């Protein structure tokens, strides 16, 4: 009796736990998922298993905060300096085009998703019924293959067994015919329409993800360009040495300086265009007969671009980077969410709750 006194409370607790699980089965999935998504080993938001729920999370933000996000994009766009090299201006413009275009893409995707869900309501039962019959047909076809294999292995004189097996095959074929006839005549047209809607939904989803990823990646690039302003400015001594060598027609030393610059530029972001100019310059001077006009043009373009790069980056570091960081705070948890290193606690809880609910994916098969 004394033993039971100690055990009873634990049994009651277990029964309560089972009762909770029975009433809230999603809780069994939610708690481990929340623990995992808030842990140090949590997957990044780019993880494929998180995409459905992250999209739900972001679309709610787009619907509720569209004006706030658009205003932030437009306000930051007004701050973009005018003294930008062409390639940097292209990156800024691409960012703003993608960021502002997000909302139209989302609306189209949501419209397509509604059309898909509406069609799927009536189509689901038909799909399940036909796939069940098709599965039976495949099983029967496998049986027929085995019987045909058995026939091939029989002795030529074993006519009796051969006839029995062929009779079984005929019966199976009749069964297949019956099952095929039970498939509604509308199946092919309905299935074709469903596949069109599914493809449209998947295409728009990919388009949306590509759009926001490119938008935020461009902003990341811009921030990195600005932060690397000191590294680029520190090349000024080599640039002056290059000017001096070119003016004195010391082309061998000029080539050596350019080679050294190439190595350093590989560690500085956003210098591809400048590296191309240096490459053009080295092409001109690495010749037996040097075209002075081409040399003058190539060197002028190279040094102008360097000064332009240093100038806009220094100016942006003082006057644009703080506003860029503020702007980033507005868009990083919606447009830029997929490219963050991890989920916030709020996001992790939402995704864990969303993923804990069973979703029917049978229509994909």
Language-model features: where?
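Alpha-helical transmembrane segments of multi-pass membrane transport proteins
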Residues: 1-365
């Amino acid at each position: 009796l004394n033993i039971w006194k100690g055990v009873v409370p634990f049994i009651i607790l277990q029964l309560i736990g089972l009762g909770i699980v029975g009433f809230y089965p999603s809780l069994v999935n939610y708690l481990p998922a929340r623990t995992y998504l808030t842990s140090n080993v949590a997957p990044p938001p780019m993880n494929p298993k998180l995409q459905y729920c992250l999209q739900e999370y972001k679309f709610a933000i787009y619907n509720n905060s569209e004006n706030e996000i658009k205003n932030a994009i437009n306000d930051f766009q007004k701050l973009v300096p005018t003294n930008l090299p062409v390639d940097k201006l292209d990156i800024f413009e691409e960012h703003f085009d993608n960021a502002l275009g997000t909302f139209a893409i989302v609306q189209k995707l949501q419209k397509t998703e509604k059309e898909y869900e509406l069609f799927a309501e009536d189509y689901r039962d038909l799909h399940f019924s036909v796939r069940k019959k098709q599965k039976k047909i495949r099983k029967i076809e496998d049986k027929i293959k085995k019987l045909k294999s058995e026939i091939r292995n029989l002795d030529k004189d074993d006519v009796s067994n051969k006839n029995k097996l062929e009779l079984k095959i005929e019966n199976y074929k009749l069964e297949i015919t019956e099952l095929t006839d039970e498939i509604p005549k509308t199946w092919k047209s309905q299935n074709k329409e469903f596949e069109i809607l599914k493809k449209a939904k998947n295409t728009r989803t990919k388009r949306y993800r590509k759009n926001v990823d490119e938008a935020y990646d461009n902003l990341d690039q811009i921030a990195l360009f600005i932060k690397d302003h000191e590294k680029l400015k520190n090349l000024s001594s080599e640039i002056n040495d290059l000017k001096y060598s070119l003016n004195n027609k010391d082309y061998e030393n000029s080539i050596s300086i350019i080679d050294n610059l190439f190595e350093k530029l590989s560690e500085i972001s956003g210098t591809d265009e400048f590296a191309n100019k240096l490459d053009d310059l080295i092409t001109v001077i690495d010749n037996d007969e040097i075209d002075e006009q081409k040399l003058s043009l190539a060197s002028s373009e190279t040094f102008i671009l360097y000064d332009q790069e240093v100038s806009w980056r220094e100016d942006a570091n003082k006057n644009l980077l703080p506003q860029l960081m503020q702007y980033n705070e507005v868009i990083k948890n919606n447009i830029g969410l997929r490219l963050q290193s991890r989920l916030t606690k709020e996001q992790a809880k939402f995704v864990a709750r969303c993923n804990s609910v069973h979703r029917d994916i049978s229509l994909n098969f």
